[in-house]
Amino acid sequence: FIAFFSVSAIMACNSNVSKSNEGNLQINQVPANDDSEMTVLMREMYDNFEIIKDSIVAGKTVDRILFNNVRRTHWASPTDSTILGPAFEGKAVDFLDKVDSLLLEKVNKEMYFNFTVQACLNCHQEFCPGPIEKVKKLLIQPKH
């Protein structure tokens, strides 16, 4: 789960995040041009989080495979290796704790999903603010 958070943070640094078609998992993308491994992983995770969000909003079961790539953040090379360190790792741990809670939650999935996205935003605010507005779009808005 730490990997997932790390990936989310670095993905956010790249403003050219692609959106997958609903239901398509993008787990094994090859970096294009000069994209770092972390950037590619962040794109995959963003796409997966869109699918997770749609499933939660529709009241469907979230496919756990959508979380399979989060641990890759431990070995994916970031665009800027200077971000790696105790502060970044702390944000990653927080994010992965949120992912664990989301996976265990049975009733308040929307709330726990938003907690997880907020953990992404917290890291991006400190390390990579570029994609913050895009990541905010993942938040599930309250029903009126």
Language-model region placement:
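C-terminal motif of bacterial Sec signal peptides marking the signal peptidase cleavage site
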Residues: A9-A12
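Sec-dependent signal peptide recognition
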Residues: F1-F4
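The canonical Cys-X-X-Cys-His
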Residues: T116-C128
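Extracytoplasmic c-type cytochrome modules immediately beyond a signal peptide or single-pass transmembrane anchor
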Residues: N16-V117, I132-H144
